[in-house]
């Protein structure tokens, strides 16, 4: 009787095939720990700069609380990369680490999707989605670069291996071809996300960003071996579904009640919306996002919505926006051309829009309840953020000092806001106090007789597609250097003028032209008061061009003062 031949079973996969599964779970656990730590940081952390601590320590504390990308991404990736190189040889088992790069990029997507939820109910009390915009930008870039490196390294590995056919590996195998498609899409996204490209055509970037993200989430499970369907695909699809639901459930139709744009030399406009579109209460400085398309229109999902800071308070009868429209004017042209750009987004009375939702500002709760020594500094259309804050603190009896400084290029911008105050019956005279005041600084010259007849000579194009807020490139021309901030004793040949041109608020609002502006001089009383009160009672708000934000932030760091800013950017 013949013995049956010995049958040898060969493993389909090498011993390293499943080496990265546990690492993927580890990344997911680190993401969860980071979220818990972030919630605790915002709930119990201290953003207040201690007067007894060094400037360096205060800076680190502030950057940590403020979700600075460099600090937070450094902490996150330090934890994630600790076990990245472990057990397997980098020279003889390099495939393990190349695959690990791919799994790392996909395992980080749930965290990225979670932090961009609008609203984010887990972090809603102590965070807003705008807090995560800088973090999201850099986190997304790192994720895409890691995924792209995974693909590039495998292509190089196959290309230099004489025993491997690159065509067979890359094209003829479905799972690898799916990965190749992902790499091409990710590369295109990275090109579109470069600053100049993104600013030149934000709509293109936004469309590519969303489509590539969806493709990355859905194609990676086809490409990945071992699979990533559970839990990663399930988590990613669930979070995507929540994003979609948020844009459906909270959205509502709206029409413009009124639009005031009848001014001779500014593209600053006042838009009035129905009060019913928002809940009974919203915090001062909140903002809304508006889409020109209905929810059933595919463009509602493909194109970006437009954010606008609410200039009203919750008790007002309407929702008011003070915004700047996109400029296409050449020097010396008429103001009507400011609103003729077909690429821009304008709110018109005859159209129906979709309000996606309203969102709270990035202002700590203790500021509203404890603040008694307040300074607000804004530039251009940043007045939409500053004005409701000023009104909120002006109406509080316990506020000891309140000053708002508004830097603008032209008197016509002030006229529009003044008209807005008159139209809404807003007068500050009934609670007049020497410690409550508005100062308006105008960088250009004007006289009361000729200011309305002058034609603007320096209007830059703006991009209305900014990720947050109604401040835009138009205001970037409002440089602090135009106000001689670097030299308080500058001997300018242009005479300074200072007067209060209104009857209703004549003693309250002071308008200054060609006035030497220095933050320290304007805030002497504010700084003196800060030494007399509890540290949690002193707050400085800033909203405007980068130079203004940097100046305000430096002032607060030097003086150990709480700082809140509204930042806009693509």
Swiss-Prot record:
Disruption phenotype: Increases frequency of mitochondrial genome loss. CDD domains: NOX_Duox_like_FAD_NADP (cd06186). Interacts with ribosomes. Signal peptide: none annotated. Pfam families: FAD_binding_8, Ferric_reduct, NAD_binding_6. Residues 101-219 form the Ferric oxidoreductase domain. It is an enzyme of class 1 (oxidoreductase). GO terms for molecular function: ferric-chelate reductase activity; superoxide-generating NAD(P)H oxidase activity. GO terms for cellular component: endoplasmic reticulum; perinuclear endoplasmic reticulum; plasma membrane. The gene is AIM14. Belongs to the ferric reductase (FRE) family. AIM14 subfamily. Its EC number is 1.16.1.-. Keywords: Electron transport, FAD, Flavoprotein, Ion transport, Membrane, NADP, Oxidoreductase, Transmembrane, Transmembrane helix, Transport. This is Probable metalloreductase AIM14. The lineage of its organism: Eukaryota, Fungi, Dikarya, Ascomycota, Saccharomycotina. It is a multi-pass membrane protein. One of its GO terms (biological process) is apoptotic process. Residues 480-505 have a biased composition (Polar residues). It is found in: Membrane. The chain crosses the membrane at residues 21-41, 70-90, 142-162, 177-197, 374-394. Residues 250-388 form the FAD-binding FR-type domain. Residues 1-20, 91-141, 198-373 are extracellular.
């Amino acid at each position: 009787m013949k013995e049956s031949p010995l049958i040898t079973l060969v493993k389909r996969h090498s011993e390293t095939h499943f080496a990265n599964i546990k690492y993927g779970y580890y990344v997911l656990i680190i993401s969860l720990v980071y979220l818990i730590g972030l919630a605790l940081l915002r709930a119990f952390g201290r953003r207040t700069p201690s007067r007894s601590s060094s400037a360096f320590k205060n800076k680190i504390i502030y950057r940590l609380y403020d979700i600075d990308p460099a600090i937070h991404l450094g902490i996150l990736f330090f934890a994630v990369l600790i076990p990245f190189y472990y057990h397997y040889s980098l020279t003889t088992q390099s495939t393990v680490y190349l695959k690990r790069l791919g799994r790392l990029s996909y395992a980080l997507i749930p965290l990225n999707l979670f932090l961009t939820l609008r609203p984010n109910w887990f972090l809603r009390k102590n965070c807003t989605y705008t807090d995560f915009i800088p973090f999201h930008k850099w986190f997304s870039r790192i994720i895409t670069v890691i995924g792209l490196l995974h693909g590039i390294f495998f292509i190089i590995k196959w290309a230099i291996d004489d025993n491997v056919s690159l065509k067979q590996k890359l094209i003829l195998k479905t799972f690898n071809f799916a990965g190749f498609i992902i790499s091409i899409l990710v590369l295109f996204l990275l090109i579109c996300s470069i600053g100049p490209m993104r600013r030149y055509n934000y709509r293109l970037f936004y469309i590519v960003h969303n489509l590539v993200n969806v493709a990355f989430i859905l194609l990676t499970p086809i490409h990945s071996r071992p699979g990533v369907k559970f839990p990663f695909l399930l988590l990613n699809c669930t979070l995507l579904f929540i994003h979609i639901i948020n844009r459906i459930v909270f959205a509502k139709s709206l029409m413009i009640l009124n639009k005031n744009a009848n001014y001779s030399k500014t593209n600053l406009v006042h838009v009035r919306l129905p009060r019913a579109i928002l809940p009974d209460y919203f915090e001062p400085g909140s903002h809304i996002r508006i889409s020109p398309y209905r929810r059933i229109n595919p463009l509602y999902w493909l194109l970006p919505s437009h954010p606008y800071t609410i200039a009203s308070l919750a008790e007002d009868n309407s929702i008011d926006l003070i915004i700047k429209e996109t400029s296409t004017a050449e020097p010396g042209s008429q103001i009507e051309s400011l609103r003729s750009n077909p690429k821009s987004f304008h709110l018109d009375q005859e159209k129906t829009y979709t309000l996606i939702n309203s969102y709270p500002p990035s202002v700590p709760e203790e500021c509203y309840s404890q603040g008694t020594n307040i300074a607000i500094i804004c530039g251009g259309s940043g007045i939409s953020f500053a004005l409701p804050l000023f009104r909120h603190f002006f109406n509080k009896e316990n506020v000891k000092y309140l000053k708002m400084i508004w830097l603008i290029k032209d008197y016509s911008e002030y006229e529009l806001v003044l008209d807005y105050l008159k139209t809404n019956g807003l007068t500050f005279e009934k609670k007049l106090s020497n410690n409550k005041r508005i100062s308006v600084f105008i960088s250009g010259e004007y006289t009361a007789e000729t200011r309305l007849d002058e034609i603007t000579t320096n209007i830059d194009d703006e991009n209305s597609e900014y990720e947050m807020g109604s401040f835009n490139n138009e205001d970037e021309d409002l440089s602090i250097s135009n106000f001689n901030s670097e030299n308080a004793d500058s001997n300018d040949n242009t005479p300074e003028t200072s007067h209060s041109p209104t009857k209703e608020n004549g003693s309250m609002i002071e308008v200054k032209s060609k006035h030497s502006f220095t933050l320290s001089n304007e805030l002497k009383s504010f700084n003196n008061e800060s030494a007399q009160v509890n540290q949690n009672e002193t707050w400085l708000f800033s909203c405007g061009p980068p130079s203004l934000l940097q100046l305000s932030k430096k002032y607060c760091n030097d003086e150990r003062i709480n700082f809140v800013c509204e930042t806009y950017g693509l």
